[in-house]
Amino acid sequence: MSREIEPLIVGRVIGDVLEMFNPSVTMRVTFNSNTIVSNGHELAPSLLLSKPRVEIGGQDLRSFFTLIMMDPDAPSPSNPYMREYLHWMVTDIPGTTDASFGREIVRYETPKPVAGIHRYVFALFKQRGRQAVKAAPETRECFNTNAFSSYFGLSQPVAAVYFNAQRETAPRRRPSY
């Protein structure tokens, strides 16, 4: 088992969201130019206000990819009836570039976990060609990554990474006596 896959299995990303796959492309997700997403690490929602920079490896500029960011734990991990909640989708990303070169078909929505610890998953799929994804999903709630990728003829995932986030508590004021 590869070291890229093991944390995805332990974190139940493979199983709950994605099927087993063999990573074949490098993907680096960075928030605020210095916070790199690592599997299973926790990030504060205040760091996630702006969409991340997502750098894609690959062999050449003639390969195109679709990036999907989703929350499989919405609205809460104990009752994820909105599984999966779609936070962002970018298609037609050329290999060896980053997501800013693609076509954003679902705008980035800041993660706002209310209850419990949520997993936020970035999954990258190789397209058969440019403009493989013809339409945006009708809703963000109850999105199904596997069904979507199958419908548009996308590959199995070629890369994935996830982080955890939970609601930030407000600073408590000390009582004045």
UniProtKB/Swiss-Prot annotation:
- The UniProt gene name for this protein comes to BFT
Q: What organism does the record attribute this protein to?
A: Arabidopsis thaliana (Mouse-ear cress)
What's a GO cellular component annotated to this UniProt protein?
cytoplasm
GO BP terms, alphabetized: flower development; vegetative to reproductive phase transition of meristem
Function summary? May form complexes with phosphorylated ligands by interfering with kinases and their effectors.
Record family assignment: Belongs to the phosphatidylethanolamine-binding protein family.
Q: SUPFAM superfamilies annotated for this entry?
A: PEBP-like
Database matches in InterPro entries: PEBP, PEBP-like_sf, PEBP_euk, Phosphatidylethanolamine-bd_CS
> What lineage is on file?
Eukaryota, Viridiplantae, Streptophyta, Embryophyta, Tracheophyta
Q: What is this protein's name? A: Protein BROTHER of FT and TFL 1
Pfam families reported for this sequence? PBP
Localization per record: Cytoplasm
Q: Which Gene3D superfamilies match?
A: PEBP-like
Q: What keywords would UniProt list here?
A: Cytoplasm
